[in-house]
Swiss-Prot record:
<keyword id="KW-1003">Cell membrane</keyword>
<feature type="disulfide bond">
    <location>
        <begin position="201"/>
        <end position="220"/>
    </location>
</feature>
<dbReference type="GO" id="GO:0008366">
    <property type="term" value="P:axon ensheathment"/>
</dbReference>
<keyword id="KW-1133">Transmembrane helix</keyword>
<feature type="transmembrane region" description="Helical; Name=4">
    <location>
        <begin position="239"/>
        <end position="268"/>
    </location>
</feature>
<feature type="disulfide bond">
    <location>
        <begin position="184"/>
        <end position="228"/>
    </location>
</feature>
<comment type="similarity">
    <text>Belongs to the myelin proteolipid protein family.</text>
</comment>
<feature type="lipid moiety-binding region" description="S-palmitoyl cysteine">
    <location>
        <position position="6"/>
    </location>
</feature>
<dbReference type="Pfam" id="PF01275">
    <property type="entry name" value="Myelin_PLP"/>
</dbReference>
<feature type="transmembrane region" description="Helical; Name=1">
    <location>
        <begin position="11"/>
        <end position="36"/>
    </location>
</feature>
<feature type="lipid moiety-binding region" description="S-palmitoyl cysteine">
    <location>
        <position position="141"/>
    </location>
</feature>
<comment type="function">
    <text>This is the major myelin protein from the central nervous system. It plays an important role in the formation or maintenance of the multilamellar structure of myelin.</text>
</comment>
<comment type="subunit">
    <text>Interacts with MAL.</text>
</comment>
<feature type="topological domain" description="Extracellular">
    <location>
        <begin position="37"/>
        <end position="59"/>
    </location>
</feature>
<protein>
    <recommendedName>
        <fullName>Myelin proteolipid protein</fullName>
    </recommendedName>
</protein>
<feature type="lipid moiety-binding region" description="S-palmitoyl cysteine">
    <location>
        <position position="7"/>
    </location>
</feature>
<keyword id="KW-0449">Lipoprotein</keyword>
Length: 277
């Protein structure tokens, strides 16, 4: 069998929904974590430069920002591993479903992979046998997990609910920066507002970013307009928007994973195959 025909047969069993969801998940998490990390750093600089001169006023905020940045590191690592595991689950269950409907058969490629993992002990040294045995044990343990799609449905459902909260929280800084930017637009065009320019302010204390006793805590008028014109403010604003888009993409990917896993599990259950196959 030629390489082209082998690849064509392998593509027949490819879970395209899981492939798209995996790519979207990696893209969304990378965008959310990377842009979110830099946006938090930019926010820290803006606060300590323009909104408060006393370190004690924003010390708690800095600790929270650093904690969120460490959480971002863990989130990126977790989603990379879990996304790869969900993709493997997609291949596993999609192959089982297509075997039920007669649309998928084990190819020579699959047999070759199986032989590579479990067979071919002759002619190997003790080191080669040990490596093959270790790989076989890993694949056996992974197969036990992949043989229970109901677990992945439950875990992915819980993860989707948690990420829905993350998605909602990622909209908060976008809302704050958008309000600040809108105020700056009103200051830049005083003819479009009846309020005095000096009364148009951005108050970090109002959003709980700083305590109420922080000084000055707010910036008004032309000073606020000059802040909005800085590259640092504009970059931070756009980074938060990008992080929000990344959170949305990750949420869509989790929903796609959950729908695909639920469908495969339902088909296997209804066709009398149970959860072990």
């Amino acid at each position: 069998m030629g390489l082209l025909e082998c690849c064509a047969r392998c593509l027949v069993g490819a879970p395209f929904a899981s492939l798209v969801a995996t790519g979207l998940c990696f893209f969304g998490v990378a965008l959310f974590c990377g842009c979110g990390h830099e946006a938090l750093t930019g926010t820290e600089k803006l606060i300590e430069t323009y909104f408060s001169k006393n370190y004690q006023d924003y010390e708690y905020l800095i600790n929270v920002i650093h904690a969120f940045q460490y959480v971002i590191y863990g989130t990126a690592s977790f989603f990379f591993l879990y996304g790869a595991l969900l993709l493997a689950e997609g291949f596993y269950t999609t192959g089982a479903v297509r075997q039920i409907f007669g649309d998928y058969k084990t190819t020579i490629c699959g047999k070759g992979l199986s032989a590579t993992v479990t067979g071919g002990q002759k002619g190997r040294g003790s080191r080669g046998q040990h490596q093959a045995h270790s790989l076989e044990r890993v694949c056996h343990c992974l197969g036990k997990w992949l043989g229970h799609p109901d677990k992945f449905v439950g875990i992915t459902y819980a993860l989707t609910v948690v990420w829905l909260l993350v998605f909602a929280c990622s909209a908060v800084p976008v809302y704050i920066y958008f309000n600040t930017w809108t105020t700056c637009q009103s200051i830049a065009a005083p003819s479009k507002t009846s309020a005095s320019i000096g009364t148009l302010c951005a108050d970090a204390r109002m959003y709980g970013v700083l305590p109420w006793n922080a000084f000055p805590g707010k910036v008004c008028g032309s000073n606020l307009l000059s802040i909005c014109k800085t590259a640092e403010f504009q970059m931070t604003f756009h980074l938060f928007i990008a992080a929000f888009v990344g959170a949305a993409a990750t949420l869509v990917s989790l929903l796609t994973f959950m729908i695909a896993a639920t469908y495969n599990f339902a088909v296997l259950k209804l066709m009398g195959r149970g959860t072990k196959f």
